[in-house]
């Protein structure tokens, strides 16, 4: 039995106008012939549908998530007598496909079996494990779309991959308040609104960009002075958050006392709050901020971020 590992054959990266990495294309592997199809790069894969029989996989179909909306992809191949199996990915819990393993018959050119692995679970092999084995994926990246070839059966399969967002640890009071998580699936940060008093940060609202639309998330209690900082998205990205945290006399809680934001153009926001206590910096070279998470109760207790890669032009 031949085994092929496809973890390195990548075409050039797909990037946006600011050099933020969108996706890379892994070349398709499998049999020859058939009509080429290409679902393109999306935000996530939501569900996999496979129809097959003893001769191999007849067709494959994917449901995707793009710009926060789920949609049904096209059927690649044809349907005949046989079995149908599905595999669901819980994208709302940030589950993502990280690799695909499979088998194809090099004589007939027909895909025989596929298995999908996510960051949370692994499917069973769908189909029959015979022929040439292959693996499709890139370490440290997630699959956000597929392409390949098909005729009366699935012939080959390739993928679009992107670097998985990195989630930072929380800074501040990590036990107080309730935990919240906006997730990493935004295009960028447009504006932040920070409410603070003489002693600590009370709340932070964030305007995210998602496919050109503003999506706002609210965290904390808006009691105090509110100031804002705007990012010139999509010409500019937020890249760094600096701040301090300390115990306050009201219950001796550990909370955030100040916040400052930096952008890809080197701009620095005003300092929100009072710089006192332990200092922290949330920044990773070559990355931009694509989402926030944190804790809040009566005060804004803690903050963390999601980083997505930027490719220098």
UniProtKB/Swiss-Prot annotation:
InterPro entries the record matches: Jacalin-like_lectin_dom (IPR001229), Jacalin-like_lectin_dom_plant (IPR033734), Jacalin-like_lectin_dom_sf (IPR036404)
Keyword Repeat applies: yes
A Pfam family the protein falls into: Jacalin
Keywords carried by this UniProt record: Lectin, Repeat, Signal
Domain of life: Eukaryota
GO MF entry, a single one: carbohydrate binding
Annotated Jacalin-type lectin domain residues: 24-163, 165-309
Range of residues in the leader sequence: 1-23
Family: Belongs to the jacalin lectin family.
Protein name stated in the entry: Jacalin-related lectin 8
Phylogenetic placement of the source organism: Eukaryota, Viridiplantae, Streptophyta, Embryophyta, Tracheophyta
């Amino acid at each position: 039995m031949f085994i092929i590992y496809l973890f390195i054959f990548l075409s050039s990266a797909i990037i946006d106008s600011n050099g933020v990495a969108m996706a890379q294309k892994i070349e398709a592997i499998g049999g020859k012939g058939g009509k080429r199809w290409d679902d393109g790069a999306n935000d996530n894969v939501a569900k996999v549908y496979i129809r097959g029989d003893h001769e191999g996989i007849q067709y494959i179909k994917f449901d995707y998530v793009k710009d926060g909306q789920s949609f049904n992809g096209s059927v690649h191949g044809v349907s005949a007598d046989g079995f149908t199996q599905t595999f669901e990915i819980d994208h709302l819990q940030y589950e993502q496909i990280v690799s695909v393993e499979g088998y194809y018959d090099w004589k007939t050119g027909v895909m025989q079996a596929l298995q999908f692995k996510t960051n949370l679970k692994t499917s069973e092999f769908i189909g029959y494990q015979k022929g040439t084995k292959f693996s499709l994926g890139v370490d440290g990246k997630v699959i956000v779309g597929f392409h390949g070839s098909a005729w009366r059966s699935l012939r080959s399969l390739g993928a679009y991959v992107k670097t998985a967002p990195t989630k930072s640890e929380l800074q501040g009071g990590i036990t107080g308040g309730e935990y919240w998580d906006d997730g990493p699936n935004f295009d960028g940060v447009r504006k932040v609104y920070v409410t603070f008093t003489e002693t600590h940060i009370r709340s932070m609202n964030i305007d995210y960009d998602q496919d050109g639309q503003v999506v706002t998330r609210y965290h904390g209690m808006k009691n105090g002075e509110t100031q804002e900082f705007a990012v010139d998205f999509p010409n500019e990205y937020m890249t760094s958050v600096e701040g301090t945290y300390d115990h306050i006399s009201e219950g001796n809680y550990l909370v955030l006392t100040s916040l400052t934001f930096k952008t890809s153009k080197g701009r620095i926001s005003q300092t929100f709050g009072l710089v006192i206590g332990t200092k922290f910096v949330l920044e990773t070279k070559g990355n931009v901020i694509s989402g926030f998470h944190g804790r809040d109760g009566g005060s804004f207790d803690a903050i963390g971020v999601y980083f997505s890669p930027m490719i220098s032009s």
